[in-house]
Curated annotation (Swiss-Prot):
The proenzyme is a hexamer of identical pi chains; each pi chain monomer is cleaved to form a small (or beta) chain and a large (or alpha) chain by non-hydrolytic self-catalysis. This is Histidine decarboxylase proenzyme. It comes from the Bacteria. Its cofactor is pyruvate. The keyword Lyase applies.
Length: 115
């Protein structure tokens, strides 16, 4: 990444995620976008399900409960995927508008998984 782009990122600008509109964003890979990037805003919540022997379904169930509880913050783009931020994506407060204190953060606690 160029020094210029690093400076832009501290201001909240990612040149691969530019829409043709002044006030609005566009969906990922929509016609008219400049670049193939996208910006994600994250909100954290948790959903609770009973633990079973199917770790995949447990994860899907808890994710869906968290999303329907109150973590959903806007329209999802089902053209490509519903909820992801891949290598072309930019995460607000991590990739752009980053607070350097994030790098010093430690977990409140850790818990060993039984499986």
């Amino acid at each position: 990444m160029s020094e210029f782009d690093k400076k832009l990122n501290t201001l909240g600008v990612d040149r691969i995620s530019v829409s043709p509109y002044k006030k609005w964003s566009r969906g990922y890979m929509e016609p008219g976008n400049i670049g193939n990037g996208y910006v994600s805003g994250l909100k954290v919540d948790a959903g609770v399900v009973d633990k079973t022997d199917d770790m995949v379904l447990d994860g899907i169930g808890s994710y869906d409960r968290a999303e329907t509880k109150n973590a959903y913050i806007g329209q999802i783009n089902m053209t490509t995927a519903s909820s992801f931020s891949g290598v072309g994506g930019t995460v607000i407060s991590y990739d752009i508008l980053r607070n350097p204190e994030v790098d010093k953060a430690k977990p409140l606690f850790t818990e060993k998984q039984w499986d």
